[in-house]
């Protein structure tokens, strides 16, 4: 019924066709139907399926893991280390087609209040932002900084607002993204990434720095900005993919008692929880 196009799709389709260490025999996008953000309705069931029925509206967790490695047991097939790991639309057929063959263990029931388009967003982009919000432990007492206002960054601000964050600050290279965030009502203060002295500006605005900084840019400068703009004892969550970052371990991290957390997509449990939280 619906299948989204992710930023990672654009990156790999146009810039990087390759196999992964987890699936060296299955190069990305080679010989497979694309679409790793699928959401639809079950029209037929295979033998042995017990948890769903024909007619159910479901979203598909976009990685099918082995089901037995420690990460799969934790509910994170995205980090599967076993044999047979394959992403829908990357190493097995995905959602950009009339029908999709999915495994029952990868399905999540779509709440009645949500559309198929909502489900497609949750199956990757919103779920990724949601996990970052959880890892950062965002609450109503927090000043939250989001660096990189693409789809995931926008969703992170939306979710932070939904959790009652005290103040939400956005940073991006593009003024039109800042304007959109302001128009949507998910951002209290916005700055261009080229603004001089941003860490000091954010420190003054928040009386000490962001309690939680979420980098959704995947950019070295963005990651450094997120770290340096975080308050003492604050949490920095790196969500954006690829790239590198360099910083002074003592001056930028240890002496400020800051904590860096890596967050990659989300778990099956949290994706289901995200869907219900959005109703």
Predicted feature residues:
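C-terminal substrate-binding/catalytic core of Rossmann-like NAD(P)-dependent dehydrogenases/reductases
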Residues: 199-203, 207, 242-279
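Short SAM/SAH-binding signature in class I
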Residues: 208-214
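Mid-domain Rossmann-like dinucleotide-binding core that forms the NAD(H)/NADP(H) cofactor-binding site
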Residues: 105, 112-195, 200
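Helix-to-beta-strand junctions that scaffold the AdoMet/dcAdoMet cofactor pocket
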Residues: 230-231
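Phosphate-binding beta-alpha-beta segment of Rossmann-like dinucleotide-binding domains, i.e.
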Residues: 62-97, 118
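Glycine-rich beta-strand-centered segment in the early N-terminal region that forms part
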Residues: 1-4, 18-70, 106, 111-113
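Generic hydrophobic/aromatic pocket-lining and core-packing "Φ" positions
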Residues: 9, 157, 178, 223-227, ...
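Glycine-centered, small-residue-biased loops immediately flanking beta-strands
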Residues: 142, 234-235
């Amino acid at each position: 019924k619906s299948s989204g196009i992710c930023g990672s799709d654009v990156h790999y389709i146009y810039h990087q066709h390759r196999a992964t260490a987890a699936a060296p025999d299955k190069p990305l996008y080679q010989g497979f139907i694309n679409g790793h953000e699928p959401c639809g309705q079950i029209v037929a069931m295979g033998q042995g399926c017990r948890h769903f029925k024909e007619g159910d509206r479901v979203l598909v967790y976009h990685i099918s893991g082995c089901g037995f490695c420690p990460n799969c047991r934790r509910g994170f097939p995205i980090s599967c280390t076993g044999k047979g790991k394959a992403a829908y639309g990357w190493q097995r057929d995905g959602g950009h087609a009339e029908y999709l063959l999915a495994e029952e263990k990868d399905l999540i029931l779509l709440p009645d209040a949500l559309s198929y388009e909502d489900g497609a967003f949750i199956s990757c982009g919103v779920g990724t932002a949601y996990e970052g919000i959880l890892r950062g432990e965002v609450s109503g007492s927090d000043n939250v900084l989001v660096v990189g206002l693409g789809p995931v960054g926008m969703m992170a601000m939306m979710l932070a607002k939904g959790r009652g964050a005290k103040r939400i600050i956005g940073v991006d290279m593009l003024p039109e993204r800042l304007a959109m965030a302001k128009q949507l009502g998910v951002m209290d203060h916005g700055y261009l990434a080229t603004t001089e002295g941003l860490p000091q500006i954010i420190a003054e605005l928040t009386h000490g720095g962001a309690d939680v900084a979420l980098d959704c840019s995947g950019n070295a400068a963005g990651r450094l900005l997120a770290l340096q703009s975080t308050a003492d004892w604050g949490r920095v969550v790196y969500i954006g993919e690829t790239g590198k970052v360099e910083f002074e371990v003592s001056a930028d991290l240890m002496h400020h008692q800051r904590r860096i957390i890596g967050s990659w997509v989300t778990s099956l449990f949290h994706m289901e929880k995200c869907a219900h939280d959005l109703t």
